Curated annotation (Swiss-Prot):
Protein task: Catalyzes the NADPH-dependent reduction of L-glutamate 5-phosphate into L-glutamate 5-semialdehyde and phosphate. The product spontaneously undergoes cyclization to form 1-pyrroline-5-carboxylate.
UniProt gene name: proA
Protein name as annotated: Gamma-glutamyl phosphate reductase
Organism in which the protein naturally occurs: Leptospira interrogans serogroup Icterohaemorrhagiae serovar copenhageni (strain Fiocruz L1-130)
Alphabetical list of HAMAP family matching this protein: ProA
Keywords linked to the UniProt accession: Amino-acid biosynthesis, Cytoplasm, NADP, Oxidoreductase, Proline biosynthesis
Gene Ontology MF terms in the entry: glutamate-5-semialdehyde dehydrogenase activity; NADP binding
Enzyme Commission no: 1.2.1.41
Length: 416
């Protein structure tokens, strides 16, 4: 099959399925999702075998430890995927929700309801759990989805899609509801971006190169899940009892994800900077330090200006020392990707100035940047974390996979 024929076939199947999905009852959708969650747990051995193939290929390609962690599935992560699907099933169905109802002076009745977007294409890298998260969210919100995962997770994604299709077939639902792009060559993506009549939205989530590639080539509206250069500022009035746990969690708990802190900003008036740097080093973090921090911890490496713009997705951290809140804010303005910024301080006025001065998808006070996540925000899961301002900003959950239709009922009215 030629490239364009392959693309149009997949897109047409998704479009056809989307017309059925939008009419499915909430109970039917929830039943299918709960069955999927059970099947993921029941067939975990098959999932692990497929994942082992990806891990083997990853080792041969010498992927970084952070990428290998993103790729890894184990029993705990499989059960976590199943749990996320159950959470999505338990969420209120946004489809049909009335967002506005009014009777006009001329007697016309207007009711605005949420409806599915239609066909959602998501392009992502490394993490196999995204296949299930996005598939479940799209299905619950009545959308068909076209999923194109990274080549490094091909076998894992393939088995996960297979299990999803088994449930759909059993329930007599078109498997075009969840379409898997089994071509890993990036050139195959471009024809998808021309299918303006078949795909309603494209969501890329991955590295800077992927985001740029999609944005430059797509004729379809793009919601960008851009890189997460997250800044964490430790104010001079920060509580030392909070600082180390927050910083360690923000960087170390899972460094290979977009809400992990990449830049640590230290006010030179904070008295426990040395202890903080030592605690990070003890956790295995490679510290890239400015001169002031390097004087406190000579075992670190000198930071380069370019480092402050990097999304490491690894146990690496750039450190910047400032002498004022204003200097910290100016630094963040230059380095932020618009994803997440956080401050640790006991001064409420400082916290207020910090949050009022910045323009990112999420701003945190006295807590870890790792909380910028759809599940943690009560959305069940997320399609991605949008760093743009249109159509959604921050975690993209169920409601953000909808648009609205206004239904107008009259009794013979005409416009004068």
């Amino acid at each position: 099959m030629k490239e364009i024929e392959y693309v149009q076939d997949l897109c047409s199947r998704a479009k056809k399925a989307s017309k059925v999905l939008k009419q499915l009852s909430s109970s039917k959708k929830n039943k299918i999702l709960l069955s999927l969650a059970d099947l993921l747990e029941k067939r975990k051995a098959e999932i692990l075998l497929a994942n082992e193939l990806d891990l083997k290929d990853g080792k041969e390609k010498k992927l970084s430890s952070a990428l290998m962690d993103r790729l890894l599935l184990n029993e705990k992560r499989i059960f976590s995927m199943a749990s996320a699907v159950r959470e999505i099933a338990a969420l209120p169905d946004p489809i049909g929700e009335v967002t506005r109802g009014i009777t006009l002076p001329n007697g016309l009745e207007l009711v605005t309801r949420r409806v599915p977007l239609g066909v959602v294409m998501v392009i992502y890298e490394s993490r196999p759990n995204v296949t299930i998260d996005v598939g479940a969210l799209s299905f619950k919100s009545g959308n068909a989805c076209i999923l194109r995962g990274g080549s490094e997770a091909f076998y894992s994604n393939e088995i996960l899609i297979k299990l999803f299709h088994e449930i759909l077939i059993k329930e007599e639902i078109d498997i075009g509801s969840v379409v898997f792009v089994d071509k890993t060559d990036r050139s195959f993506m471009i024809p998808f971006f021309q299918q303006t009549s078949l795909i309603d939205i494209v969501v890329p989530r991955g590295g800077e190169g992927l985001i740029r590639f999609v944005s430059e080539n797509s004729k379809i509206p793009v919601v960008k899940h851009d890189k997460g250069v997250c800044n964490l500022y430790i104010d001079q009035d920060a509580d030392p009892e909070k600082v180390i746990p927050i910083v360690i969690n923000s960087k170390v708990q899972r460094p290979g994800v977009c809400n992990s802190t990449e830049n640590l900003i230290l006010h030179n008036g904070y008295p426990f900077r040395k202890e903080l740097l030592e605690a990070l080093a003890k956790e295995g973090v490679e510290l890239l330090l400015d001169p002031s921090s390097l004087a406190l911890y000579p075992k670190g490496k000198p930071v380069k200006q370019q480092d402050y713009l990097e999304e490491f997705l690894d146990l690496r951290l750039s450190v910047k020392t400032v002498s004022s809140l204003e200097e910290a804010l100016a630094f963040i303005e230059k380095t932020s990707s618009g994803h997440t910024e956080a401050i640790v301080t006991e001064d409420l006025n400082t916290a207020r100035i910090f949050t009022n001065s910045l323009d990112s998808a999420a701003l945190f006070i006295n807590c870890s940047t790792r909380f910028h996540d759809g599940g943690e925000f009560g959305l069940g899961a997320e399609v991605g974390i949008s760093t743009g301002k249109l159509h959604v900003r921050g975690p993209m959950g169920l409601v953000h996979l909808t648009t609205t239709t206004t239904y107008v009922t009259g009794n013979g009215q005409i416009r004068g």
